[in-house]
């Protein structure tokens, strides 16, 4: 069952933390989260799941930043959230989707007990100008039935910034089959 907006408001400070909280962004069954002023892009041409990838930080100026098609941008919400005894989920706003901007490629599902900022996996199908502080996605909450343990992984928990993929920490690393270069940079 999904919580109503009024139920979200009533659980603030106990099972739900949203900081900062603006009552004007509360919807009938969700809350609008806003875009922070920075993005990350990957520098590698090919991303290897078994290796950490270099990133480049971009600032979104007040006059906006144009996102190019066929480029993955990692952003984050400006709001810090905590969820206890509920399952948090985020979904892109329909007004954003109608501009051809995907806000999260796959990871809209959160874990009970998650604390931190939501990393957004943004992908534009055509050039789109974005702005810091724009309401970019909605968070909503499901009740959980049955016994559970709160999220305890240290991989993304308590993050304070945009989080690139940390999948490499879960995978065994194999040696590179290529010969080393005979010169140094």
Question: Which residue ranges define each predicted feature?
Answer:
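DUTPase catalytic domain/fold
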Residues: 1-185
């Amino acid at each position: 069952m999904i919580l109503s907006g009024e139920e979200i408001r009533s659980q603030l400070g106990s099972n739900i933390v949203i900081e900062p909280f603006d009552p004007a962004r509360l919807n009938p069954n969700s809350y609008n989260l806003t875009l922070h002023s920075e993005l990350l892009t990957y520098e590698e041409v090919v991303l290897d799941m078994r290796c950490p990838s270099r990133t480049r930080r971009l600032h979104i100026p007040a006059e906006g930043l144009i996102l190019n098609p066929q480029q993955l941008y990692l952003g984050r919400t400006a709001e810090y959230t905590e969820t206890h005894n509920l399952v948090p989920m985020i979904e892109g706003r329909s007004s954003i989707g109608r501009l051809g901007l995907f806000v999260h490629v796959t990871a809209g599902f959160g874990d009970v007990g998650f604390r931190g900022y939501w990393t957004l996996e943004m992908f534009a199908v055509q050039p789109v100008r974005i702005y810091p502080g724009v309401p970019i996605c909605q968070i909503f909450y499901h009740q959980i039935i049955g016994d559970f343990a709160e999220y305890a992984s240290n991989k993304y928990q308590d993050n304070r910034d945009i989080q690139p993929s940390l999948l490499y920490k879960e995978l065994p690393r194999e040696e590179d089959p290529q010969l080393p270069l005979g010169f140094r940079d």
